[in-house]
Amino acid sequence: TDIVVPREIDGGTVIDCNSFYNHYEIKSLRVKAAYSGWRVYSTQSYEEDYQGSRVSGCTNLEYYEMAEDTTSLNKWKLEGCNSLKTIVIPKGMKEIFASTFSRCKKPEKVIFKKFSNLENITGVKKLPWWRKQHTKKNGMVIYKNCLIDTGKREGTLIIRGNKIKKIMGNAFANSKAETIKVTGAPKLCMWTFDDCNAKKIILGKKINVIPYRCFGSNDTLKEIHILSKGEIIWGLDSYGNYQGLDMYTPKSQNLDIYVYSDKFHTESVKKWRCDERVTVHVPKKVMAKYRKYTNCKVVAL
């Protein structure tokens, strides 16, 4: 059975989110309807609602084109899809988590409607055939000018932004480099440096936007250098909101951040969530402002 669900009929959503649960007869499903808010479109009570997956139990589903408003994909959303061959990733997708294909048959084909909108595809890069297909001679996984994985590079790792347009989430998770330097102006993402083993991260003069949770969680990180002399936007999320600098570091770990710009973006700096374990080295001109809006130790460059 091949089912195509239109976006709407007479301005209303066509189906509720439980419509395909345990429908083993479906082989192909193309969903155009928009119903991202699970409870908003469910016709069942909260107790009866199966919140894990819209297609859970579709054991014969081979082709699945997801609804355009789907923003993330995890193992629960494909649970039990044991015949899956092709999955179409919609334009609105932001994150495909590491465990995405752990509870279903691993697809043989992944189609991206707009790859440039994605920020994390850890689940896809764990597919052996996909990783092999896009691994370069230097061991890096690169697709459509986006750096997906740096491989197990050691020493000093330099990423040149003239060739790389975006650095995805968890791109350095397998890297053994102690120093990471990013030049040019590639776009960074949430979790770009998460789980890296670096002691020092250096961001080049053309990088002015530090996405929300860009540095993620790191047990070894000692220094961050922001070389830009322009206004730095801290913690910009995918919805355009300012979340400030949010670092996950062990309680015993101290971190030094060197900011070379004497320009100050108040709206994003006042959202910083770092404490006195973080020492910020800034130009004298903006020391007072950093002391006013953050809980960090502030010293002059």
Regions found by a protein language model. Give the residues of each.
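A structural signal for leucine-rich repeat
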Residues: 55-56, 78-79, 101, 215-216, ...
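Terminal, low-complexity interaction segments
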Residues: 289-293
